[in-house]
Amino acid sequence: MPSLNDIRSTFLDYFRRNGHRVVESSPLVPRNDPTLMFTNSGMVQFKNCFTGLEHRDYTRATTAQKCVRAGGKHNDLDNVGYTARHHTFFEMLGNFSFGDYFKSDAIPFAWELLTKDFDIPKEKLLVTVYHTDHEAAEIWKKVAGLPDERIIRIPTNDNFWMMGPTGPCGPCTEIFFDHGPSIWGGPPGSADEDGDRFIEIWNLVFMQNEQHPDGSMTPLPKQSIDTGMGLERIGALLQGKHDNYDTDLMRSLIEASAHATSTDPDGPGKTHHRVIADHLRSTSFLIADGVMPSNEGRGYVLRRIMRRAMRHAHLLGAQDPVMHRLVPALVRQMGAAYPELTRGQALIEETLKLEETRFRQTLERGLRLLEDELGHLPEGSPLPGEAAFKLYDTYGFPLDLTQDALREKGRKVDVEGFEAAMAEQKAKARASWSGSGETKDAAIWFDLAETHGATEFLGYDTEQAEGQVLALVAAGAETASVGVGQTVQIILNQTPFYAESGGQVGDTGELRTDTGRARITDVKKGQGLFLHFAEVVEGEIRQGQGATLVVDHARRSAIRANHSATHLLHEALRRALGDHVAQRGSLNAPDRLRFDFSHSRALSPEELAAVEAEVNGFIRSNGAVETRIMSPDDARALGAQALFGEKYGDEVRVVSMGTLAGSGKGTDGQTYSLELCGGTHVSRLGDIGLCVILGDSASSAGVRRIEALTGEGALTYLNEQMKRLTDVAAALKAAPAELVDRVKALVEERRQLQNEVAQLRREAAMGGGAASEAKEIGGVKFLAQVVQGVPGKDMPGLIDEMKARVGSGAVLLISDTGGKAALAAGVTPDLTDRLSAVTLVKAAAEALGGRGGGGRPDMAQAGAADASQADAAIRAAEAVMGG
């Protein structure tokens, strides 16, 4: 019986033999499509190839694409674990043609692979075609010998695929497997098609038309193929299973869950194990691709999936975090096919453990609240939206987690009420991304890239170069020229200006032509083009002119120093804190650097000092910074660090810094820092000058942020700090070396003086001011006193002294603090069961225009706006006692 890993390899090997390039799966976070939350099909990374906006050095491709469907239009989350074929994570096997072959090849490819390589009996297969696609039907008859009754013509959009409202589209043919009459269900297109007898295993899309905004449709100049076959589904079929969760890969994860929770994988908790197995895959792959749990966007979807799995682990009786303990089982199954899992294992485990530990603190309380709410409702009635929102807002229960919990009880949630409560509190709504269209502005850059090709970057070797102005874009449109005062985006054939990427800001500088001069204020990258944001400061700039390009040297040098220091900082943090440390973001600007990294706690002062010392040690060593070009695989083999979610081509730049015996990195195993990086760097570490860490703070859950200065910025900062130190020493009339002891002495002296002042205030207050004699009200002694200038913090001590004077009774103290009143009341312990200081102080405060007040039955305090009516306040307290 072939494993899922075998099936994946068989698929890719088949198409490799048939002239296809095996292309790595793209990340789950789409690189160039902001409208799509997660990669959810194999064609996503090839979208621009199909539209003609991108050309690659191959026209046939095959992939095993990792996909997530857990939000927006494609949301399988609610059904995961309860059905045989719903998943949040799945692998889509596909073959693609970009203007190369079409139906007459795509259909034979599919038939041969299924019936020969996968050895599926031909009589078990049937197909659907779009009702007007006679060509596909005839090819099926010719290639497969299928009779008419096993070529079902479908008139609905189920067999007509469209990329969006406009763009490439075309009919598709779907291949089905017949499990036989022992399983209920009818063929596709019939009334019983939702049964499980006939299962779709492969969809072949024939992109042959283009849909226009006016609704018309015209043939595409280049016809293309896009196919998709779910690995889990074909795997179940080839392993003789009717349930995807019974395949070898899913079964191994289910058994790992059962082992970790000491439960039966097929017992009453079977559904819980299925949910955990599925969600382990989606959460692990999302983290490996750079998504971290948060309260918005992709991070929130990840958190929803994590917490749903964690609730099911809780239902299995797990008392401690479970998910992170299952990661090794996943890596064993899928790490070879997806090396990013292995590389990110430590981060995945730490993130899962941290999130589950935090959520577990509120999970049980939230579930108790849910049970309490249900206990007050009639049998079968839905949970009010306000209650569901409270679970979300207070206990971190995503709505679908609450729905999942209620599903087991046959209940639902008032979703409209939940949404109304969400809107009322103005909580952040999850982003709802759908579609796959491009913006109008983006189309300009696609067109320019198509016309002129990518910009050549020269800035690794020079800060000045000659180039040609290929295009000028102002106010979102191309223009032939721009004059003084106009802002413009300039496209050149080549440039020494670095475009913002990888955390490094874009260069600034100047562009000069024979007719004008422009100040370059920023450079960004899009579709391979370097977009030079500029303002014309002299004459005019014309399309087609030659130009001299000069980068601001001082600014570039400062940026280089900060970027190189970031690499040293990254390695020093990994060595100090552990291999789980991974870059989560950075900023390399001329005036500072910022480095975000995965770590769950604040660094101690000692850890920060050690990291800073290690970085500066390598700076002082003045070792050479070397850059080599190699394949990503070769770079990783040498131990190079790659950034999560970063797109790498066939060749990468690998930057090495410093020497450390036994590091295991580099060709000699003695390189200190080795990273894949496209940024600019110093030539020797000594060029950084100095690195000063300013501090460590939380950036987001599980992510810390360090900010630092280098070079002249660091020196200026230290000089300023030294001046402050000198100024303080002069003010205290002490040498700088004596400052710590001097400040400690001053703090102690101040503390003693504060205590003395407080004591004097108490003595003055008790010895002066308006004081009444203790009187008896309702059989209880009552003593009231009005004092001047006693702050609220000193009043509890005075109340204790007043209670001591009366022995048994109640006391009230009113202090005039500059027109406003501070009040305190006290009741001796023997009377607190019948009289409360809180009641007394509230009544007195209300007489002075105050509201509230609180404390204990034996001592309470309050404040009020008007201290002039102290007598009225005393009478109000007396009235309470006499009442």
Swiss-Prot record:
It is an enzyme of class 6 (ligase). Pfam families: DHHA1 (PF02272), tRNA-synt_2c (PF01411), tRNA_SAD (PF07973). Its EC number is 6.1.1.7. One of its GO terms (biological process) is alanyl-tRNA aminoacylation. It catalyses: tRNA(Ala) + L-alanine + ATP = L-alanyl-tRNA(Ala) + AMP + diphosphate. Its cofactor is Zn(2+). Signal peptide: none annotated. Belongs to the class-II aminoacyl-tRNA synthetase family. Catalyzes the attachment of alanine to tRNA(Ala) in a two-step reaction: alanine is first activated by ATP to form Ala-AMP and then transferred to the acceptor end of tRNA(Ala). Also edits incorrectly charged Ser-tRNA(Ala) and Gly-tRNA(Ala) via its editing domain. This is Alanine--tRNA ligase. The gene is alaS.
